[in-house]
Amino acid sequence: MREIVHIQAGQCGNQIGTKFWEVISDEHGIDPAGGYVGDSALQLERINVYYNESSSQKYVPRAALVDLEPGTMDSVRSGPFGQLFRPDNFIFGQTGAGNNWAKGHYTEGAELVDAVLDVVRKECEHCDCLQGFQLTHSLGGGTGSGMGTLLISKIREEFPDRIMNTFSVMPSPKVSDTVVEPYNATLSVHQLVENTDETYCIDNEALYDICFRTLKLTTPTYGDLNHLVSATMSGVTTSLRFPGQLNADLRKLAVNMVPFPRLHFFMPGFAPLTSRGSQQYRALTVPELTQQMFDARNMMAACDPRHGRYLTVATVFRGPMSMKEVDEQMLAIQSKNSSYFVEWIPNNVKVAVCDIPPRGLKMASTFIGNSTAIQELFKRISEQFSAMFRRKAFLHWFTGEGMDEMEFTEAESNMNDLVSEYQQYQDATANDGEEAFEDEEEEIDG
């Protein structure tokens, strides 16, 4: 079977990751002790994508949990699904990274990284045919961003032909934990551009907006935000975990979604987003799902897709529904909003349908868009970065760990290049290239 090894790094990564395991354990009928209590053969058919089956019929997540301080790990271990994970797969330091990317990437994190790689290697040896890795982390802190990107590059060295997929929580302007977030995020993006195959950009600000506006929560907690993220992660990985009509694995997804290797930053979305109490008052239809899912307010990244154009889109519909209706709706959306899809990639919307809906819903859909509007997110971080870097504010924390200012300059220019690449493809039209060819031909004739 095509296995995936899951890694969660840092506080945010561990909280989102653990929530993800709770959700998919529930979907596959795995109880907190790892026993199977489900009622459908479909739940077990592809269970070994994410779980190892132990000799005593216990299903164990194929996961490595990493942090530079013990706190988060303790709360995972004492949480509802704490007994699910293999005890040896908790790897933590004692010092913490103090929201410092350099500590996570060069000093503290580098000391712990070999222990993590040992666990990852062990998990990979249990695999029949490993398809790739997924990492959950945030880019604003120290461990998830610094050590997370270090792990990615080390794993890349050792498994160069496997897919590397990350769920990265981007720092947002309104919800800020630390002053140096723009530094940490820029240094991380610099790594992600080079070393990952697909990155789902999740943004706290967008999640807060969804909680306020759509779910009508007056005081959203991190628990509510993580609930949204886990619903999205569960949706994105559906076609890997359940037999569906379009069985995507990570590589097929990458082939469909990434037209240029550097432009692999996706905007996820989820529908239906209804507040907890109001679900019973409405029946969902495929047209409603499709409508909601392309709505800017349902995006988990704080970018407006109407400000850019979609290079590619993948959608996953879950629940009993007719394929024909789904295809008709998707075509309708594309023809109505054709200006928002680049015309030089025909058939750039892919649809997968899975018969098993998420817990508590009759039908649901997940959206993955590769849109040029994601540049707004990078622009925002880049502006904050430049404002501080111009004054060299807080830089001594990083140089003190052995970093060079040159690295900051490189990361900054790499991010700006990324923004202009997105802009270039946003402006490109189908006949741009032809004009260039005509010019060349004239020169040859001359």
From Swiss-Prot:
Locus of motif MREI motif: 1-4
Phosphoserine, modified sites: 172
Gene Ontology biological process terms in this record: microtubule cytoskeleton organization; mitotic cell cycle
Keywords: Cytoplasm, Cytoskeleton, Disease variant, GTP-binding, Isopeptide bond, Magnesium, Metal-binding, Microtubule, Nucleotide-binding, Phosphoprotein
Top-rank lineage group of the source organism: Eukaryota
Cofactors required: Mg(2+)
Tissue specificity statement from the Swiss-Prot or TrEMBL entry: Ubiquitous. Maximal expression in breast and lung, where it represents around 10% of all beta-tubulins. Largely decreased expression in most cancerous tissues.
CDD domains to which the protein is assigned, alphabetical: beta_tubulin
Residue numbers carrying 5-glutamyl polyglutamate: 438
UniProt keyword annotation of Nucleotide-binding present: yes
Listed GO MF terms: GTP binding; GTPase activity; metal ion binding; structural constituent of cytoskeleton
Residue numbers binding Mg(2+): 69
Pfam family, one: Tubulin_C
Coiled-coil segments: none
Subunit description: Dimer of alpha and beta chains. A typical microtubule is a hollow water-filled tube with an outer diameter of 25 nm and an inner diameter of 15 nM. Alpha-beta heterodimers associate head-to-tail to form protofilaments running lengthwise along the microtubule wall with the beta-tubulin subunit facing the microtubule plus end conferring a structural polarity. Microtubules usually have 13 protofilaments but different protofilament numbers can be found in some organisms and specialized cells.
Biological role: Tubulin is the major constituent of microtubules, a cylinder consisting of laterally associated linear protofilaments composed of alpha- and beta-tubulin heterodimers. Microtubules grow by the addition of GTP-tubulin dimers to the microtubule end, where a stabilizing cap forms. Below the cap, tubulin dimers are in GDP-bound state, owing to GTPase activity of alpha-tubulin.
The protein, known as: Tubulin beta-6 chain
Organism per entry: Homo sapiens (Human)
Gene field: TUBB6
